[in-house]
């Protein structure tokens, strides 16, 4: 019996990709942390910065660590990711809608 060395699965990232992702993640974490700790801006600006940095950090993690891209051979990964985002969005928006309606209806009486 011989052992096959053929790896037909998805390729792993390089050290450069992992280090780039790690450094970007640190930067995207330190900036909002610094803004909150020093009070560098108004609360609305800080909240906007935190949300923007969080979205960018999610994208960095998806690309650098989870190797999500639009290549055709990884189409199923992207399809599964889009489906997951859709389901989470439905759950979050639906939950907020239900809580808002409950609050509105309970306060009427």
UniProtKB/Swiss-Prot annotation:
> What are the alphabetically sorted keywords of the record?
Cell inner membrane, Cell membrane, Electron transport, Membrane, Oxidoreductase, Transmembrane, Transmembrane helix, Transport
Q: Organism's domain of life?
A: Bacteria
Q: Which residues lie on this side of the membrane: Cytoplasmic?
A: 1-17, 65-80
Query: What does a knockout show?
Result: Increased reduction of the ubiquinone pool (in aerobically grown minimal medium with glucose).
* Residue ranges that the UniProt entry lists as topological domain Periplasmic: 37-45, 100-109
Extract one GO molecular function annotation from the record: proton transmembrane transporter activity
Locations listed in the record: Cell inner membrane
Q: Which GO terms describe its biological process?
A: aerobic electron transport chain; aerobic respiration; electron transport coupled proton transport
Residues passing through the membrane, by range: 18-36, 46-64, 81-99
Is S-adenosyl-L-methionine one of the keywords UniProt gives this record?
Answer: no
Q: Which family does it belong to?
A: Belongs to the cytochrome c oxidase bacterial subunit 4 family.
State the function annotated in the UniProt record. Answer: Cytochrome bo(3) ubiquinol terminal oxidase is the component of the aerobic respiratory chain of E.coli that predominates when cells are grown at high aeration. Has proton pump activity across the membrane in addition to electron transfer, pumping 2 protons/electron.
Q: How does it assemble?
A: Heterooctamer of two A chains, two B chains, two C chains and two D chains.
User: What is this protein's name?
Assistant: Cytochrome bo(3) ubiquinol oxidase subunit 4
What organism does this protein naturally occur in? Escherichia coli (strain K12)
Q: List the lineage, top down.
A: Bacteria, Pseudomonadati, Pseudomonadota, Gammaproteobacteria, Enterobacterales
Quick one: which gene encodes this? cyoD
């Amino acid at each position: 019996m011989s052992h096959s060395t053929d790896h037909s699965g998805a390729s792993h990232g390089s050290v450069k990709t992992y280090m780039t992702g790690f450094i970007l993640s640190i930067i995207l974490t330190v900036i909002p942390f610094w803004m909150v700790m020093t009070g560098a801006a108004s609360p609305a600006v800080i909240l906007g910065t935190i949300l923007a940095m969080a979205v960018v950090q999610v994208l960095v993690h998806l690309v650098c660590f989870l190797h999500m891209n639009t290549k055709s051979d990884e189409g199923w990964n992207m399809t599964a990711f889009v489906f997951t985002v859709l389901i989470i969005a439905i759950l979050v928006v639906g939950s907020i809608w239900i809580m808002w309606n409950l609050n509105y209806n309970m306060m009427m009486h």
